[in-house]
């Protein structure tokens, strides 16, 4: 197995879980790790929120043993708040601290953070420098190709990140204005890799083991990061590990196996957030696991009414029975 070294943190060169706000929570990250993700990144936390002692913001930074190696991610555009937030984040003992300079969402960029930092290279450099000076662990940055098609400046921004002390740079191959539409431009990732000496993490449109290897080969990147391609498919990380090592990988789980995996995921959510909140938050991931099953729409509706793990267990058994009946009909 090959490894990538990020500021002294040794990471297997397979696939990492990308940071995804309101998606990649602790349960999601643990699922990814259990299925072979080499590295995970937490949900982004506001630097100002941390400095103002916001409890919910601080909760985003906690790290459990089953998630390591893990980066916590911060966003902000004021160096003094970034410095303070890094000092607070280090109390949670993350392996890496990541600075979000790629989020395209309006509520983030309207405040000058996220991908808006790519429009202000000097400020971006000051933010990264403030984080690096305050940190005792490696600092990485996550960027996009640029703001729009007329301002593709990922290479310039990556160079500034390196000069400012960043240990690695992750590049999503879309612009801010693309959001998540269209195709990720892997040429931008390759150009960044050819322009800096720190590790480059490629991100965008990796949804199969074959595409993961293709990104490695085409861009020359040091690590591949998977985001939306893992929705309801934590086993993708295992398949990627298998494919990179042997050239083949295990088949997709059966309907029954997917339901067992869904149960595990929802149990983790409930363990982390309690049954009342956890069962509500489980509706979204449940819909991903049920996708493609016969009667999926009906079962999604039924999942939205669940309030306890016992109810979930009964529903899973019911779905398994119906999937089994359909499988027998197909024979």
Model-derived features: positions:
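Flavin-dependent oxidoreductase catalytic cores
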Residues: 1-331
């Amino acid at each position: 197995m090959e490894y990538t070294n990020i500021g002294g943190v040794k990471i297997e060169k397979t696939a990492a879980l990308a940071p995804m706000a309101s998606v990649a929570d602790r349960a999601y990250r643990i699922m990814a790790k259990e299925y072979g993700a080499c590295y995970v990144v937490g949900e982004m936390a506001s630097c100002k929120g941390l400095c103002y002692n916001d409890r919910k913001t601080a909760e985003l930074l906690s790290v459990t043993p089953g998630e390591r190696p893990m980066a916590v991610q911060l966003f902000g555009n004021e160096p003094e708040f970034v410095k303070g937030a890094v000092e607070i984040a280090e109390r949670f003992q993350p392996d890496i601290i990541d600075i979000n300079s790629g989020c395209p969402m309006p509520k983030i960029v309207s405040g000058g953070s996220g991908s808006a930092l790519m429009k202000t290279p000097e400020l971006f450099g000051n933010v990264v420098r403030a984080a690096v000076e305050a940190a005792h662990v490696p600092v990485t940055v996550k960027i996009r190709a640029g703001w729009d098609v007329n301002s593709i400046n990922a290479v310039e921004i990556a160079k500034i990140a390196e000069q400012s002390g960043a240990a690695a740079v992750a590049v999503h191959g879309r612009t801010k204005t693309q959001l998540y539409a269209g195709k990720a431009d892997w040429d931008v990732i390759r150009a960044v890799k050819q322009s800096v000496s720190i590790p480059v993490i490629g991100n965008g449109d990796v949804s199969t083991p074959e595409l993961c290897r293709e990104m490695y080969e085409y861009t020359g990147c040091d690590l591949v990061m998977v985001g939306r391609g893992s929705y309801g498919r934590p086993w993708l990380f295992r398949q990627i590990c298998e494919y990179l090592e042997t050239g083949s990988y295990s088949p997709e789980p059966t309907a029954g196996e997917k339901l067992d995996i869904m149960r595990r995921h929802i149990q983790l959510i409930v363990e982390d957030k309690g049954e009342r909140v956890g069962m509500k938050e489980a509706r979204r991931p449940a819909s991903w696991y049920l996708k493609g099953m016969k009667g999926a729409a009906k079962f999604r509706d039924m999942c939205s009414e669940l309030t306890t793990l016992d109810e979930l267990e009964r529903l899973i058994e019911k779905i398994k029975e119906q999937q089994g009946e359909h499988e027998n009909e197909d024979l």
